[in-house]
Regions:
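Conserved N-terminal catalytic core of the sugar/cofactor nucleotidyltransferase
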Residues: 1-53, 134-136
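Short, well-ordered coil/turn elements that cap or connect secondary structure elements
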Residues: 3-4, 26-28, 79-81, 149-151
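Residues at the starts of beta-strands that form the adenosine-phosphate
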Residues: 7-9, 83-84, 153
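Glycine-rich beta-alpha junction loops
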Residues: 15, 90-93, 161, 170
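Conserved beta-loop-beta/alpha segment of the NTase-like Rossmann-fold superfamily
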Residues: 30, 39-100
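Conserved alpha/beta core of the MobA/IspD/sugar-nucleotide pyrophosphorylase nucleotidyltransferase superfamily
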Residues: 53, 113-184
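A residue-level structural signature of the nucleotidyltransferase/glycosyltransferase Rossmann-like core
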Residues: 63, 84-86, 104, 118, ...
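Short, flexible, basic/aromatic active-site loop/helix in glycosyltransferases
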Residues: 96-119
Length: 184
């Protein structure tokens, strides 16, 4: 919230949630309590109705270590009139295609990236893409995939690998260590 590249923050919260309102951040005038959907893409689609800016950045709470430098990398692209851009990191590990726990083949990694958030798009295009995905019951794992379905090209912006997704207890331990050492 102390970033010059971010305006208001809409937090998608389910109707059943009793925790968000107890957080200090929920009382910040720049934080707007939005609607929660069944799926992540539903939450984003529902809350885009309240966005009046030309561009929107979509982020998720599972990536709390986003840097201001990465936010700036996305924000400056709005001057170039791009459809959208996502933060990502080049894959450095060897990739294996697997079926029934058996290795099928090694997948070339030269053009592979791990998609991160935030992802930034022209608001009207993202609305259109998510409405299309919803109407056609498409499984959307990130906002860029909804844009791809309609043929909108987005840019890859090399992001900080410290902006990893917290999904396991080990991820949480690593994040705590990074915060303690000031690496966020």
């Amino acid at each position: 919230l102390n970033c010059p590249y971010v305006g208001n923050v809409i937090v998608g919260v389910s109707d059943e949630d009793e925790y968000f309102d107890t957080l200090e951040i929920s009382h910040n005038p720049r934080v707007i309590k939005g609607k929660g959907g069944k799926e992540r893409s539903d939450t984003v689609r529902l809350n885009l109705e309240t966005v009046a800016t030309e561009y929107v950045m979509v982020h998720d709470a599972a990536r709390p270590l986003i840097s201001q430098d990465d936010l700036k990398k996305l924000a400056v692209l709005t001057k170039d009139d791009v459809n959208g851009a996502i933060l990502a990191c080049k894959v450095s590990d060897t990739l294996k295609m697997v079926s029934d726990e058996k290795i099928i083949k090694t997948v070339p990694r030269e053009n592979m990236y791990r998609a991160y958030t935030p992802q930034m798009f022209k608001t009207k295009l993202l609305k259109q893409a998510l409405e299309h995905a919803d109407k056609n019951h498409l499984a959307i794992t990130d906002d860029a995939s909804a844009m791809e379905v309609l043929g909108y090209e987005g840019l890859i912006v090399e992001g900080d690998s410290g902006n990893f997704k917290l999904t396991t207890p080990d991820d949480l331990k690593l994040a705590k260590l990074m915060i303690e050492k000031g690496n966020n």
